[in-house]
Amino acid sequence: EMRIRDSFYAIMNIAEEGDHIVCASALYGGTYNLFAHTIRKMGVKATFVDPDCTEEELNAAFQENTKAVFGETIANPALTVFDFEKFAKAAHAHHVPLIVDNTFATPINCRPFEWGADIVTHSTTKYMDGHAACVGGAIVDSGNFDWAAYGDKFSGLTTPDETYHGIVYTEKFGKAAYRTKATSQLMRDLGSIQSPQNAFLLNLGLESLHLRMPRHCENAVKMAQYLQGHEKVAWVNCPSLPGSKDYDLVQKYMPDGTCGVITFGLKGGREAAVKMMDKLKLVAIVTHVADARSCVLHPASHTHRQMNEQELLEAGVQPDLIRFSLGIENIEDLIADVEQALED
């Protein structure tokens, strides 16, 4: 999963044994597992905070050895919307960068750098490719964070690299220090170099991204509105709908749309969800998300199955939650498929 690899590189490019990071708790399951368990074995600990926490609660999570703050623009699958300005303010007050996973929103709907983020990651396997045809990821550095100003905290960037002819990245590369270290050190030693074929397919996807994203968003809103009016549906979560918990944040950060993913639950709970998904014909049950074809998934038993009940709730994943990734098909066809699947 490239989203996990990107997050790993983004953090470990500046963190080492004995360090600490602060993360919003609403995360993709694999990313949560990476921060809660895997990098902990490497000596880097994470403190998870509720995305809706107060500024006081957020600041209390920082430690002397904190190296970064991490969050997702739109959490998968909780769809919690990240409050950039709140987290950026706290990160910069503690002299650390804000790193944001912008996979779901894409740069079409949200530009995190404009709201205080310093580094942005993407699983390009999702909307950027858009056709589930290639695997890839990206780390984008704004060049805005002044690593040299806090040299003792980020010594990997401000002191000589013995593995690279004694280069001091901040002196040699200036604003490009972070991304140069990531490619010349981490990628050199750990790999993750995209193949030419994957790069070619990704480039094709990027050429139509600006056309596809509005359709994804439009289909998501229309499907959410349909589900809201169905007698068998207990709840619907679509951040772009008025009345949603994070609607004000959407209007602030993503007024033109969020993404093509919505979530909902049925009154019959988990059993009803499984039954309904099995009856779908056009919409497939797929672990993948965010491409041209519509698909559904039950995250609690798939993408987030490694998490316990408490961790699931903290990540915003209810036991009955169905994740619905709307593609770019005709919305009337998609609604008709859902309608027949909900029939007794």
Please name every model-derived segment.
Residues D146-W147, L209, G269-A272, T303-H304, ...:
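Short, acidic Gly/Pro/Ser/Thr-rich loop/turn segments
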Residues G18, G29, A36-H37, K45-A46, ...:
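PLP-dependent enzyme catalytic core of the Aspartate aminotransferase-like
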